């Protein structure tokens, strides 16, 4: 299994251009939060409802498992920084705005991905996740690596 530093080095290969980096620092958190919003609104089996789970929670459990495999408490910090505010917001807003959470999340998700692809067009390199889907989980860590020192 790759170390966090190995993931960052490989991810960084297709993220050298200043404009692309700026676009990523805006779009990656938006994609993360909007994906959680979309997953939050997808109907779940009755057994999930009885214990208060939804598809966002399931996704976060898989993401956390991957992050734990990287053996870094700072990674867990980024996970919490991304997941906890989103879950609190969705839990509070879902009864109030309902389907609008889904619609607004889809709009943000699509626009943020368009931004990502524009960034990669400027960069002149394909997104890393074309090579390995796990890079979709590395992106948020890489974006926050400037804020939280990962001792790269």
Where are the regions that the model predicts?
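Hydrophobic, membrane-inserted alpha-helices
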Residues: 34-36, 58-66, 82-90
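Transmembrane alpha-helical segments that form the membrane-embedded catalytic/substrate-channel core
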Residues: 60-73, 108-124, 143-147
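Helix-coil boundary and interhelical linker segments in multi-pass alpha-helical membrane proteins
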Residues: 36-54, 88-105
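Hydrophobic alpha-helical transmembrane segments
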Residues: 57-61, 76-80, 102-106
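Cytoplasmic-side transmembrane-helix entry/capping segments in multi-pass membrane proteins
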Residues: 76-84, 131-133
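Membrane-proximal soluble regions of multi-pass membrane proteins
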Residues: 1-14, 18, 121-152
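Membrane interfacial helix-start motif at the N-side
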Residues: 8-29, 63-75, 122, 149
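Alpha-helical transmembrane segments and their cytosolic membrane-interface
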Residues: 2-53
